[in-house]
Amino acid sequence: IKLEETYAKSTLIKKNNKLYGLISLPKFYVDFDDYKERNCASDVKKEILKLKKEGMEGLVLDLRNNGGGSLQTVVDMTGLFIEEGPVVQVKSFGDRKQVVYDKDPSIFWDGPMVVLVNQMSASASEILAAALQDYNRAVIVGSTQSFGKGTVQNVIDLNRFLSNSKFDLGALKITTDKFYRINGGSVQVEGVKSDITIPNRLSYISIGENDEKNPLKWDKIDSADYKKWDRYFNLDEVISSGNDQIEKSQLVSLIKENAKWIASRQNPKSLTLNYLDYKKSQSDDKNYLLRFDDIKNYKNDLEFEFIANDEESIENSKEILERRKRWAEGLQSDFQLNEGLKVLDNLKLKVINKKSIIANND
């Protein structure tokens, strides 16, 4: 069964007479039986090549609601955007640590880049976002911070210790390692903090590793040896002005107010058992929610153009068109995406004389 909705997908976006690319990655997937046959890093590379062929001028990588997956695909995917270098550090007990490297010097996209995250971007998503942030390779746009899962778990089957048992003894999941950014900081609990913060309807809901019982604490180790990407001409300026614009946005003020209202409705201390009182409460809520119609009715001015894959032309085109139609409808009301594209609009690259190591073929 093909789980198409979990695979990487892309679209071209027209904004202000410019052409941008969006790649959505819901999960870091891999075929463990045959890594080369299917993995998300290879799929993202294919989408980049497709978008570049059409003249993409900037890239948005959407990691929202991506709960993680294969570490190897994170390393390979980071390598699509940087020259060779460290991607993540892994530390177990004692002073031992392992630095995991991208060893391929080729780059498949060296233009402006934005990464979208939210509170549900976790684990492998955080490793990728953190690495691109530490390298100054991409601007992270989204919730105040990501989920904050910076640990590695191994599952131990207890049945192997007692082979003659008539009962299923189950398994133990044990935390064995922690992930660290290449700058030395952990993503545990604190997650990846966005460069440009955009609230959403869940901003005041308790979501994340820090809201679990007894989470491991944040800590820091020595930085890995890496060189920051220095092609942006105005990175700090774009981040500063982006946050200023968000603070002044009337829609953002509404989103914050709505998020606070949603949080206030969680775990109420009391509920009326009187039907008339309950009915009035529901009516009051309905009237109050009318003030948030601007959020519900929000539409951006983006134009989307989907590029067909060779294999898609052979498959059921009606099903593919229906999927893309649903995706486009969601994107047309996506405020965070539109703000990410504004960042791409403003990012300027330095002109360099030396020849970049850019890969055009796979």
Which residue ranges define each predicted feature?
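A residue-level signal for beta-strand positions that form part of recognition/binding surfaces
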Residues: 19-22, 171-173, 215
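Cleft-lining beta-strand/loop regions that shape enzyme active-site pockets
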Residues: 1-161, 329, 333
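Low-complexity, polar-biased intrinsically disordered regions enriched in Pro/Ser/Thr/Gly
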Residues: 32-37, 157-169, 317-324
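Mature, folded catalytic cores of secreted/periplasmic enzymes
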Residues: 70, 99-100, 139, 166, ...
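Polar, glycine-rich mid-to-C-terminal structural blocks
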Residues: 124, 136, 141-207
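Flexible glycine-/small-residue-rich
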Residues: 24-27, 63, 117, 174-178, ...
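Conserved functional hotspot residues or short segments at active or partner-binding sites
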Residues: 181-359
